[in-house]
């Protein structure tokens, strides 16, 4: 049975870079943001519920209007809870199906910016936090999303603080542009194999 890790971190922290490096090293990672978009696009029940909540224009032309949904989602914590209540249960089920086909592997991962807030943390065995200084995160996100600083800060304020995520994490990766990532990821993999060895020993005893 594979050990499941949850990779999280704030906007612009570099979660995707860490996930990509893990995949290069042979650890498959379920990218919840990408997979949730696929689930939303193909599940007629979700589409109807989102249209009822946000308005028909959220699926204008038959495609999800990601900008409109994001604007609604980040407008208030109530809106976020409403949207997440529609999408997250389906994504959890999809992740369970995905991971059930990878039981022969030692380590698999799930990447989610809201791993803890969404309840996805309940689906994994340990949490890996990707940390970057706030100023650097904002700079990265503004450049990547072509958004304003205020828009990015609004999204950051809507999520759990880095400090709280670090407290909940079993392992923290620093992605500040100075500390090399690969040695940290190799250290993470070694840490996970120690955990696997411990679990196997405990099971045999």
UniProtKB/Swiss-Prot annotation:
SUPFAM superfamilies in the cross-refs: P-loop containing nucleoside triphosphate hydrolases
Gene3D superfamilies named among the record's database cross-references? P-loop containing nucleotide triphosphate hydrolases
Q: What class of enzyme is it?
A: transferase
Pathway where this protein functions = Cofactor biosynthesis; coenzyme A biosynthesis; CoA from (R)-pantothenate: step 5/5
Its function, per the record, reads: Catalyzes the phosphorylation of the 3'-hydroxyl group of dephosphocoenzyme A to form coenzyme A.
Regarding protein family, the annotation reads:
Belongs to the CoaE family.
Please give the name of this protein.
Answer: Dephospho-CoA kinase
């Amino acid at each position: 049975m594979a050990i499941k890790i949850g990779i999280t971190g704030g906007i612009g922290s570099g979660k995707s870079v860490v996930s990509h490096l893990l995949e290069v090293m042979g650890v498959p990672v379920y990218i919840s943001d990408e997979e949730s978009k696929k689930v939303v696009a193909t599940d007629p029940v979700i589409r109807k519920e989102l249209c009822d909540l946000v308005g028909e224009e959220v699926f204008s032309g038959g495609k999800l209007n990601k900008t409109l949904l994001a604007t609604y989602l980040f407008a208030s914590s109530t809106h976020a809870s409403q949207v997440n209540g529609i999408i997250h249960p389906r994504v959890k089920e999809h992740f369970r199906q995905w991971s059930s086909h990878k039981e022969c592997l030692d380590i698999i991962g799930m990447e989610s910016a809201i791993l803890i807030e969404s309840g996805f943390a309940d689906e994994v065995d340990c949490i890996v936090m990707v940390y970057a200084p706030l100023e650097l995160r904002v700079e990265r996100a503004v450049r990547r999303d072509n958004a304003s600083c205020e828009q990015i800060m609004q999204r950051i304020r809507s999520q759990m603080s880095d400090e709280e995520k670090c407290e909940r994490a079993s392992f923290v990766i620093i992605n500040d542009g100075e500390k090399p990532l690969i040695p940290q990821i190799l250290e993470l993999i070694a840490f996970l194999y120690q955990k696997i060895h411990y679990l196997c020993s405990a099971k045999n005893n």
